[in-house]
Every structure is written in structure tokens, then in C-alpha cells.
Amino acid sequence: MAMALMTPSALQAEDALPGDGTLRFYRLAIPVTVSAFENDLQGDYGLFDDDYQDKVIPFWQACEDFVNEVFVPLGMCFDVVMDKRLVMTEHINALDKSEELPEIGNCTNYINDAIGEGSYDVGMWVTHRETYAENSGLSVEGGAYINSAKGSGYAKTDKWVVAHELGHMFGAPHTTTGEGSLMDSGGDDFFAYPSIKTIRNKAKGTSSYKNVKVDNNAPKFNAEAMQKTYRIPQGACLSIDVQATDAEGHRLLYTAIGCSSANVDNIVEGGSMPHFASFVPQESNVITYQPTYIADIMYDDYFYLKDGTDVPNMEPGNYALSILVNDVPSTAWSYSELQATPFYSTYAIWESQVQIVGGTAFNAKLAPAKNQYTAGEQVTVSWGVNENYFTADSRLRISLSTDYGKTFSATNKIGIKN
């Protein structure tokens, strides 16, 4: 959750990716309230020195590692301030509210009083939140760039929520509900394109604890191997073979995001447009929008849908699709590694369109049905044919999966008349 504080320094810049080639280092303060120390970290003030070393420090380190994992591709690196004074020994009534909304107006002042204004660059409190509380965190959108609000945020004692709220602090709103990315409720560990663009735009030209200019060429698409329009029949899945290279031979990550607008940038907080869920950036260059099924370990013959996509359920029409490729460091994405070998991730973006042709959906059916089938019995497969997409010369290939849709290695028939 974020609240906007409208000041001139919080206005969104208009520059697009890849940014300004500057790796920014920040000192991140994560103050711990009494409720977080006792309830979440299971700390005992009677054993404070031991629990500080055994419980607080490991939590801070886990936060640092995770925050860097998701922010380094944006050109930001964080060093968590390991200072015992950031563990509160007295209740701060405005923050130790496990059910109600904590008050963030004085959060920055509390940190300044504890360790000094010049000892950190951005702060994020952690405090205990009940599961039924109204939210898991709140912060000032763009607060990292406002001196009086640079510590005005809180999160429940969870590294993912800390990173999410920091996304707000560096200017990103929520993406449309349904996304799997860090700035939505999906729970995956990455920023989607709209968030990346917003955060990098706002960071451009700003100072940090340490700015390091890095020369790095962006990856390039093989335009001859890419398409501007990907045409599929209604109800179908979508697979795109992305062809890109990097001049320095860096490791590449691939992702994509699409929506019903003419511009993916319109996927922001409050939007309700149908859209394709963002991919977790992957090393495979094949972007595939298809359901994946996972076998349930507790019940035989039962599976559930994981990382489902709305593409097969999309209405006919044209959808914007942005395909992103970025290079990443081959070493660990830690503060110490990037201090020694600075790296600034660069992006190539392929803007395209997905055209979903309306008509009869494929919808394969089996006879007899699964619950009526006996081993060895012949099975008849039937399917719908979209005559607006397929022609009389179209042929069908039937591939089967034995691992719940992860791979389709068994091909029964090739060239069946549709």
C-alpha cells in the first residue's frame, strides 16, 4: 500500500528505459519495533545481546539479500545498516499497532533520533501485523527522494513486504490486480515492466550514498526473427521464441507483459483492463503463456493450477505486448560483489501486438471422461475448430504431457486434418 505525497521532487520523469547508466548504492535502515522483535523474531529483551546477533542480524541480512535480488536489475544496490540502536526497546505507540493502521508521519524522525539523519539514505520500519489487519505495510510513494519522508514507511516483518514497500518509496504504484509481480499481490520476486520504468525514471539524475557510472551496451533483438504481430485463435495459448544477443556476452533474462490497451504503461494502480500476467524473468528465451499444473502431494490423481494465465480466456481483439530482455551480472548480486565489480543492467524492449481471432475455441474433449475411463480403453479426442483462423488445409498435431504441462514430449499424431 502506498500514499502519495505530492511535492515537486516526487513528480514522475518522462525518460524511458534503459535509464542513465548509473549504479546507485543506498544505506537501508530497517528499524525493528518492540512488537516485531518479540512477536515475529521471537526475541527476548532479557537476552537482548544474544538475540540481536542470532535473530535480528540474520533477518536484516535476509532482507538485504532479497532486496538486492529484485532491485539490482533496476540499477540499485542496498547495504542494510546493522546498528543495535535500530532495535527499539520501548513501544512506539504510533507504530506498535498490530491491527489498526500505524501512523507513518513521524517515522523518519524516529529513525533520525535513533541513529542520526546522515547515517542512512532510506528507511523501512518492520512491525508486527496480525493476519486480519487492514494491510501489511504502508509507505509514502516517492518518499526516498524526500528528506523528510525517507524513512516514512512500515512493513510486516517479512522481506517480501519490505521490498514491496521500498518499491513504493522509490516511486512505483501498484500494477493492475492479477499481476504476479512484486508490486502486486501475486507474490513473485521481481518487478514488472511498468514498475521498472517508473522506478528507473524517478532515479535518473538523482544522487545516492554512492553513484557509479557503468558503461554497458544493451542487448539487441534479431529483428528478422521477431514479429510485430502474433496471431492466435481464441482460446489458444501463446509461445514466443525471443531472439536477442548481448555484445559483451552477459547472461540474459527474458520476460513479457501484455494488456488490452495500446500501451503497456497503462497497467497501473486502479486499472481493470484484461492483461497477460508478467513472467518471472527467466533464462529461457521462449516466453510461453500456458497453464501449468502441479500434482498434489497429499491426494492421488489431483492437481492444481499454478501460475495460470488469462491468455486462453481472453476475448477476441488486439493486445499490446512488451517483450523485455536485460543483461545481469554473472556474480552474486550482493552489495559487496557490486562494490567490487559494479554492474548496470540494460534493457531491450520489443513492442508488439497479440491478435486473438474470435471463433470457436479449441477446447479438446475426451470420451470417455476421466472418471469413466478404464485402463487400456480407447479414447476419442474431439475439439472445436475456429474457422476464422484455420483453413481447410490446416493440420493438427496432438502432443501429450506426462508431467502436468511442464513438457509435451509425447506426440501421438502429426498432420491430422483439422
Role assignments for model-derived ranges:
Residues T229-L238, K370-E377:
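Short, solvent-exposed loop/linker segments at the N-terminal edge
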Residues I232, V242-G249, D327, G384-F390:
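Extracellular acidic, Ser/Thr/Pro-rich low-complexity tracts
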Residues N216-F221, T360-F362:
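Proline-centered linker/hinge motifs at extracellular inter-domain junctions
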